[in-house]
Amino acid sequence: MANVVVVGSQWGDEGKGKIVDWLSERADVVVRYQGGHNAGHTLVIDGVSYKLSLLPSGVVRSGKLSLIGNGVVFDPHAFVAEIERLKGQGISVTPESLKVAENTALILSLHRELDAFREDAASNSGTKIGTTRRGIGPAYEDKVGRRAIRVMDLADPETLSLKVDRLLTHHNALRRGLGHAEVSHEAIMQELTSVADKILPFVDRVWKILEDARRAGSRILFEGAQGTMLDIDHGTYPFVTSSNTVAGQAATGSGLGPGAVGYVLGITKAYTTRVGEGPFPTEQDNEIGEFLGNRGHEFGTVTGRKRRCGWFDAVQVRQSVVTNGMSGIALTKLDVLDGMEEIKVCTGYRLDGQVIDYLPASQGAQARLDPIYETLEGWKETTRGARKWNDLPAQAVKYVRHIEELIGAPVAILSTSPEREDAILVKDPFQD
C-alpha cells in the first residue's frame, strides 16, 4: 500500500477536484501541504457541489481525518467562513475531523491589502503578475523573513503582541512608501484575538499525527494545489505562486519524511489552460481557444476569471514528470476534444533558430518560444462517460497512448466527464 501525492502538472486547473475526491474516498488521511485559499476546486458528492479553497477534500467525507500542514499559509477568517459555508450544506467540520499544524503561518488583512496595493501599482505600469489578491505572496514573504505570526501564537497573547510589533515595523514602512495609511497594533490584535477561540481547538502537531498514521498503516493522501508550472522555483517565474507546488513539498509542508511518499500522481489536462499573466507557448488566441474554453467551461473556481486555452504541451508536461518524479498521470477532460477534426500536440520548441526539448528558465527565452506541433487525427464519436477502453474511439486511444510516449509516464486514471464515476482506472495509486 502506497501513500499518494497529487500534483498538477500544468498551470493548475487540471481537474484535481474530481480525482482528489475519488482518491479521498479511499484514503484515511487527507493533507494540504502548500498554498492557501487562492486555489479552489469543486467536489460533487451525491449531486451536491462543495467548493473548497483552504480545507482539505477529506472534510466532506465522514470518517476521514483532514490535516492542514505547516507549508500552507492560513487565513483564519477565511477558514471560519469556509467551515460555516459547509455547515450550511450539512457538513460538520470539527476539531476531531480536522487538525491545523501549530507552526502554520497566518495570512492577515495587511497581507491582502499589500497584495492589492502592489497589483494595482503594477497594473498601471504593465508589470502585474495576476495574483488572486488574497495575501498569499506577502504572507510567504513574512514567513521567509522570520516575522510571520503563526497559529500557535494565538494561544500566547504576550508573545503575540511582541510579534505584531515586529510585523508592523516592516509593514508600516512598506505602507508609507506606497503612500498608504499605517495599521495600528490594536487593529491587528483585535483581528487575531477575535478569531483565536475558533481556531485554537483545531491546532495540533500535524507531523506527529502523520507519523502515527504512517506507523498504523493508514492510507495518506497529500493534496496539492495549483500546478507545477506555478512553482516558485520550477515554474514560469515570476508569473508563479509563492510556494513550491512540486511533489517534494509534500514532505516539507507536512512534516512527514520524503521516504513516506509512495505514488506521485500528476493531474494532466488533455489540452492546456492558464489563468492570469505569463508565458503560454501553445496558447490559441483564436476560435480553437474559444472552443476549448466554452466546451471545457474554463473559468476559475475562486476568481471566476476566464482561462487562456491552448494545445497540449508535451514538452512542458514531460518536464513536470521529471521535477515531480511522477509515477503516473490522471488525464482529464479528454471529452472536451470530441468532434475536433484534428488535434495538435507540442513536441518541441524553436528558440532563436534552434530546436530545444525543454522549457527554458529565462523569462525572455520563454517569451520567444515557437512551439513545434505534431498534428493528430481527431475523432467524431464521443468519449464522454466512457468507463472502459472499449468505450473509446480508436483515435482517442491513439491520442492517449501517444501522450504517454511523449511525456514518459503512464496514464493511471483517464477522466471522461466531470462526473466522478466517469473514469477508466488503469492503476490504483494506493496499491503498491
UniProtKB/Swiss-Prot annotation:
Gene Ontology cellular component annotations, sorted alphabetically: cytoplasm
Q: Which residues bind GTP?
A: 12-18, 40-42, 307, 333-335, 415-417
**One term of GO molecular function:** GTP binding
What biological-process GO terms show up in the record?
Answer: 'de novo' AMP biosynthetic process; IMP metabolic process
Q: Where is the chain membrane-spanning?
A: none
Entry EC number(s) = 6.3.4.4
Q: Does the keyword Membrane apply?
A: no
Subcellular compartments: Cytoplasm
**What family classification does the UniProt entry report for this protein?**
Belongs to the adenylosuccinate synthetase family.
Q: Spell out the subunit comment.
A: Homodimer.
Query: What is this protein for, i.e. what is its function?
Result: Plays an important role in the de novo pathway of purine nucleotide biosynthesis. Catalyzes the first committed step in the biosynthesis of AMP from IMP.
Q: What is this protein called?
A: Adenylosuccinate synthetase
Provide the species name: Chelativorans sp. (strain BNC1)
